């Protein structure tokens, strides 16, 4: 009887040890280090970096890797299979292309924030430009390439609506993204540039001299979505939801974005 009891106790102990190890293993697995890649419009960089720092502080097993660039270039990268878990675009048409092609499910997307287009000049320069009305007096103007840079496309729309495009198109120096356009203005290589308000606000080297009225260009909306081929759907979904939270939205608004 005692022998049977001893065998039972030994078996129970072994079972509990195995169960305990499994439980610990499960706990460890659930906290495995995960790196999320977000392909994001260059204009969102400052806000995103602060938001990500806050998120990583509370989710220490998550590392967020950024891939910044023009929305058009990022869209092409994702279409060609470049690894990304989320896409944060500054252009609805580039984002819609991925949805239409099945790279992002509509149910996994949202219109997150909005922005504005402004005219900037070098802070310590002697630019003749004081508003859109006398932009034609400038020698060089920086603008994002309209075909791939959303800010450039919106800027061209505004310049066309204001009957300025034909007067200034031969003076334009094109940038690969909005940050390059801003850099041209900051260094005084151009007299003025057309950028997002959010970019102008984070620069200490430019002055905003005018804002493009909303009726001069298409609505500026930044869509966010989870890439269908993500290998970390659970973690991508959690960060996707966090970006829509009140906490994250306060940071976006701090950098000049508007809530949608």
From Swiss-Prot:
It holds the Pfam family SBP_bac_11. One of its GO terms (molecular function) is metal ion binding. GO terms for cellular component: plasma membrane. Residues 1-20 form the signal peptide. It comes from the Bacteria. A lipid is attached at residue 21 (N-palmitoyl cysteine). It is a lipid-anchor. A lipid is attached at residue 21 (S-diacylglycerol cysteine). Its main location: membrane. PANTHER family: MOLYBDATE-BINDING PERIPLASMIC PROTEIN, SULFATE-BINDING PROTEIN. This is Putative ABC transporter substrate-binding lipoprotein YvgL. The gene is yvgL.
């Amino acid at each position: 009887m005692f022998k049977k009891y001893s065998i039972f106790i030994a078996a129970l102990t072994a079972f509990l040890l195995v169960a305990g190890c499994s439980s610990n293993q499960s706990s460890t697995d659930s906290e495995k280090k995960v790196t999320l890649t977000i392909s994001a419009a260059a204009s969102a960089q400052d806000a995103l970096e602060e938001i990500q720092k806050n998120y990583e502080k509370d989710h220490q097993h998550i590392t967020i890797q950024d891939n910044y660039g023009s929305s058009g270039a990022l869209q092409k990268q994702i279409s060609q299979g470049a690894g990304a878990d989320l896409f944060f675009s500054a252009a609805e048409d580039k984002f819609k292309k991925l949805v239409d092609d099945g790279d992002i499910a509509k149910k996994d997307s949202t219109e997150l924030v909005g922005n504005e287009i402004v005219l900037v000049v070098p802070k310590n320069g002697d630019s003749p430009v004081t508003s859109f009305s006398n932009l034609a007096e400038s020698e060089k103007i920086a603008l994002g390439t309209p075909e791939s840079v959303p800010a450039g496309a919106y800027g061209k729309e505004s310049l066309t609506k204001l009957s300025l495009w034909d007067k200034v198109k031969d003076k334009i120096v094109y940038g690969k993204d909005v940050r390059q356009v801003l850099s041209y203005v900051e260094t005084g290589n151009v007299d003025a540039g057309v950028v997002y308000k959010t970019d102008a606000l984070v620069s200490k080297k430019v002055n905003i001299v005018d804002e493009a009225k909303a009726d001069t260009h298409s609505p500026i909306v930044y869509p966010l979505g989870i890439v269908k081929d993500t290998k970390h759907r659970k973690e991508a979904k959690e960060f996707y939801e966090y970006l829509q939270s009140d906490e994250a939205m306060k940071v976006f608004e701090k950098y000049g974005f508007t809530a949608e």
